[in-house]
């Protein structure tokens, strides 16, 4: 159990002392700082530290709690050669000029829907069909009703229940449980996730129309298998990437980031919205584009 008597490393103190403003990377900053705090403080203490550091900032409801819970599965391990301050520099800044040019050129949600080889508006594919075709019928899948209720089970053991889950890890797992940073067994950890099968691109700002244009543009660079509405304010674009290393995927992720993508989905065990499922408030995870033909 992390102890609040342990002094924070200087780089963590530096991070906490200089949060960006809303619109300047605050959402990503919360995730990054929470990630390095996990081995040093309890969940409640991390929330308190982030609340204190961002006092007066226009935070979204639940934003800090979500950052803390979402970052735990890829928490920093003390002893790793990591300098979050310098590591952050490798991520490109959002290029608003380039982003606007793409938005003006590439179309909107109507165009994204029209690009789908499988027309999903009248007869949408079921969650079971999508997962069978994209993830495979003989694999281990990690899913959950909430961020904190992850389970990893054989595909057939999930049969008929996946649409009741809010979240899924977009790559198969290799075993039922792995070890977290503090050595505890967990169904969702870097210790039991397999090679990336999909890299999911999510944007935390911009309208649905703008996000659609960005996904259309990115689909010219990589195979877009699925576009799913989060039931809130974003679209999750599933890009097929089986067989590619993180080094090979990094330029694409950086390009997506420069156009407004969140960094959090780079973490291979980050939960994303279940295709065809429902948000906890009942809002559907509508499938806008479904292209199983790109999956080999």
Model-predicted regions and their roles:
Residues 225-232, 263-267:
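Short beta-strand
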Residues 182-187, 213, 219-223:
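Alpha-helical scaffolding within the catalytic cores
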């Amino acid at each position: 159990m992390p102890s609040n008597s342990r002094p924070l490393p200087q780089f963590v103190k530096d991070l906490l002392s200089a949060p960006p403003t809303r619109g300047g990377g605050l959402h990503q900053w919360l995730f990054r700082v929470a990630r390095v705090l996990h081995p040093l403080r309890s969940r409640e203490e991390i929330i308190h530290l982030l609340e204190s550091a961002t006092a007066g900032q226009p935070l979204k409801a639940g934003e800090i709690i979500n950052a803390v819970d979402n970052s735990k599965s890829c928490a920093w391990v003390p002893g790793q050669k990591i300098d979050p301050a310098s590591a952050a520099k490798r991520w490109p800044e959002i290029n608003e000029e380039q982003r606007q040019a793409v938005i003006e050129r590439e179309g909107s949600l109507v165009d994204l829907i029209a690009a789908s080889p499988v027309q999903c508006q009248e007869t949408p594919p079921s969650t079971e069909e999508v997962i069978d075709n994209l993830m495979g019928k003989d694999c281990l899948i990690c899913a959950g009703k909430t961020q904190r209720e992850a389970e990893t089970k054989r595909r057939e053991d999930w049969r008929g229940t996946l649409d009741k889950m809010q979240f899924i890890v977009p790559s198969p797992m290799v075993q039922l449980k792995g070890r977290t940073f503090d050595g505890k067994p967990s169904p969702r950890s870097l210790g039991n996730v397999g090679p990336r099968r999909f890299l999911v691109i999510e944007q935390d700002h911009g309208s649905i129309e703008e996000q659609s244009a960005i996904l259309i543009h990115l689909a010219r660079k990589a195979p877009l298998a699925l576009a799913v509405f989060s039931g809130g304010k974003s679209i999750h674009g599933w890009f097929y990437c089986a067989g590619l290393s993180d080094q090979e995927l990094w330029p694409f992720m950086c390009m997506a980031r420069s156009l407004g993508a969140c960094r959090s989905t780079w973490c291979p065990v980050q939960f994303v919205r279940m295709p065809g499922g429902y948000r906890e408030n009942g809002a559907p995870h509508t499938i806008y584009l479904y292209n199983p033909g790109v999956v080999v």
